[in-house]
A protein has these predicted regions:
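Extracellular LysM carbohydrate-binding repeats and other cell-envelope/extracellular binding modules
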Residues: 30, 50-90
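Surface-exposed, short loops/turns at beta-strand junctions within beta-sandwich domains
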Residues: 317-324, 412-419
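Extracellular fibronectin type III
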Residues: 335-348, 429-444
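Short beta-strand segments within Ig-like beta-sandwich modules, predominantly Fibronectin type-III
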Residues: 305-311, 400-406
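Conserved aromatic anchor
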Residues: 277-286, 371-381
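Flexible, surface-exposed loop/linker segments and immediately adjacent secondary-structure boundaries
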Residues: 74-78, 82-275, 387
Length: 450
C-alpha cells in the first residue's frame, strides 16, 4: 500500500476523530462517561467512594444506571460514571532519570532550580535541558518521555483521573527533541498530546520522536510504532509506524513519507573489555548522515550520554565508564527525517585495569624448564589472577591461580617443551575482577642433548 493510500485510509479512523473532537469548535455534544465493570461483591456505595469526588453521589449513579438494589450488583454490569464526577489525583509527573544539567525555568525563561532524579514535576513547569543532558519523565498513566539535549518543554496539562488509569497529558515542545513511549489511552478523556510551534499531535498509545528547530519551529515527527494524528493550519494527517512528516509554521501539512530502514550493525562482542569501543554499520541507501546515540542504562532507564550526527558509517569511544549501554544508529534523509533504529546492547568492563606483563617477554624463546612470570603494579589492584595455557583462546589451561597476593607479582612454573600463552587480571580490595591483559606468548624449547 502506498503512503498516500495509507494516509487516506487512516484519516477516516477513530484517532483523527478524537483529535478533531478535542480541537476548538468540535466540542462533544454529550457528557463523557467512564465505565466501571462490576466485580463479585461490589456495592454501589463502595464504587462511589473509590471513584467519585463526592461518595454521596452513589444515589445519582443508582438512578442513571438503573440499579434496583445498590447492594446487589450483577457482576459484569457496567456502571457509567460521568467524567466530571470522577476523582482526580494530584497533577504531577516524575523526573525518573536526570543526566547532566536540567533546569526549571521561571516565566521569564530564567533558570530557578535544578531538576534531579526523583523530583516531582508540576503542571505548568517549563523545563530546559543543557548540552549533553537528558531527562526522562514518567506521567500518571506510566507513559514516558525522554527529553533530549538542548530542549525546552512545558507541562501544559497533567490531569490524573485516579484509579481509572486515565490521564490527560499535554506537553508543549518549544525547541529540541523528545522520544515518547505512550501507554494505550483507554477511556473517553485519556489523552497524550504534544504541541509545537508548527504542529499538534495526539496519540492513543504509540512510540514516536519529534524534533523542533530552535530557529523557525519546524517540526519533524517520526513514528516508530502505532499511529499519530497530526494537525496544522486546519490540515490533518495520520502518521503510521515507519513514516514521518515535516511540518513548518504557517503551512499546511504534506503527506507522510516513508522513513529509512535501520542500518545493519557489524558483528561485535557484547562485552567490551578494552577501550576504545568501536562500531561500524553498513552504508544506508538514502542516508546523507547518521544519528549516533550512546545510552547508559541506569536502573532500567535510558540516559543519552552521546548524541552525535556523523557523516561516516563508523564510531568509536575512547572513554566509557564500566556499565551497561545501548548503541542506537539511524539514517537521516534529505528532509532531515530520521529512520528506524539499529540497536545494540553491550557491557563495558575494562576496570580494574590489568597490569602490564614483564617476563617472559612476548615471543620469548628459552630452554629453561622453570619459568618465572612477572608483571607490573596495576592501579586499583590489591591482588592478581594468573592463567597459563597451551592455546591463545585459553581453553587448554596448564595453570590457573585465582588469587595471587599483590605484593608478589610473580609466579614460578616448570613447563615441558612447547608454545604457551599467559595473562594476568587485577582484583580490587572488594573482590571485583577486571579483564585479563593481552596475552603474551613464549616457547620453551627442548634442551639440546649432549
Amino acid at each position: 500500500m502506498s503512503a498516500s493510500s495509507m494516509v487516506k485510509r487512516a484519516i477516516n479512523g477513530s484517532l483523527l476523530a478524537c483529535l478533531l473532537i478535542a480541537a476548538p469548535g468540535h466540542a462533544q455534544k454529550t457528557e463523557p462517561v467512564w465505565g466501571y465493570k462490576v466485580r463479585p461483591g461490589d456495592r454501589l456505595i463502595d464504587i462511589a467512594k473509590s471513584y467519585q469526588k463526592n461518595p454521596d453521589d452513589w444515589k445519582k449513579l443508582q438512578q442513571s444506571n438503573t440499579v434496583p438494589d445498590p447492594k446487589l450488583l450483577q457482576p459484569g454490569k457496567q456502571i457509567n460514571i460521568p467524567v466530571a464526577d470522577l476523582k482526580q489525583g494530584d497533577p504531577f509527573a516524575a523526573a525518573v532519570l536526570v543526566h547532566g544539567d536540567v533546569q526549571r525555568l521561571d516565566k521569564s525563561g530564567q533558570p530557578v532550580a535544578k531538576v534531579v532524579s526523583g523530583d516531582v514535576l508540576k503542571m505548568g513547569d517549563t523545563i530546559q535541558t543543557g548540552a549533553r543532558s537528558t531527562l526522562t519523565v514518567r506521567f500518571a498513566d506510566d507513559s514516558r518521555m525522554l527529553v533530549t539535549e538542548k530542549s525546552k518543554i512545558t507541562l501544559s496539562s497533567l490531569v490524573n483521573y485516579g484509579k481509572t488509569g486515565m490521564a490527560d497529558t499535554k506537553v508543549q515542545v518549544h525547541q529540541g527533541g523528545t522520544d515518547s513511549q505512550v501507554s494505550p489511552q483507554k477511556g473517553p478523556v485519556a489523552r497524550y498530546e504534544i504541541s509545537t510551534p508548527a504542529l499538534n499531535l495526539a496519540v492513543r498509545g504509540t512510540g514516536f520522536r519529534i524534533q523542533v528547530d530552535e530557529g523557525n519551529g519546524a517540526t519533524r515527527t517520526e513514528v516508530v510504532e502505532g499511529l499519530v494524528a497530526g494537525e496544522s493550519q486546519g490540515s490533518q494527517a495520520m502518521i503510521a509506524a515507519g513514516f514521518g512528516i515535516l511540518a513548518e509554521p504557517g503551512k499546511a501539512l504534506g503527506q507522510p513519507t516513508r522513513l529509512l530502514n535501520a542500518p545493519v550493525l557489524g558483528e561485535t562482542s557484547n562485552l567490551v573489555k578494552k577501550l576504545p569501543a568501536r562500531f561500524e554499520w553498513t552504508a544506508l541507501a538514502g542516508a546523507l548522515r547518521y544519528r549516533v546515540q550512546m545510552l547508559a542504562v541506569v536502573q532500567g532507564n535510558d540516559a543519552i550520554i552521546v548524541d552525535e550526527v556523523s557523516d561516516n558509517n563508523k564510531a568509536q569511544w575512547d572513554e566509557l565508564p564500566d556499565g551497561d549501554y545501548r548503541l542506537r544508529v539511524r539514517g537521516i534523509d534529505a528532509s532531515g527525517l530520521e529512520g528506524a533504529n539499529a540497536t545494540k546492547a553491550f557491557t563495558v568492563k575494562t576496570r580494574p585495569e590489568p597490569p602490564e606483563l614483564s617476563l617472559p617477554k612476548n615471543e620469548h624463546r628459552s630452554v629453561d624448564e622453570k619459568v618465572v612470570f612477572r608483571w607490573s603494579v596495576a592501579p586499583q589492584a590489591q591482588d592478581y589472577r594468573f592463567q597459563l595455557a597451551e592455546d591463545a583462546e585459553f581453553k587448554n589451561l596448564v595453570a590457573a591461580v585465582p588469587r595471587i597476593a599483590g605484593s608478589n607479582r610473580a609466579v614460578l612454573f616448570a613447563v615441558p617443551a612447547g608454545q604457551y600463552y599467559w595473562r594476568v587480571a587485577s582484583i580490587t580490595s572488594t573482590g571485583d575482577v577486571g579483564p585479563f591483559s593481552d596475552a603474551f606468548t613464549f616457547t620453551r624449547s627442548a634442551a639440546a642433548t649432549q
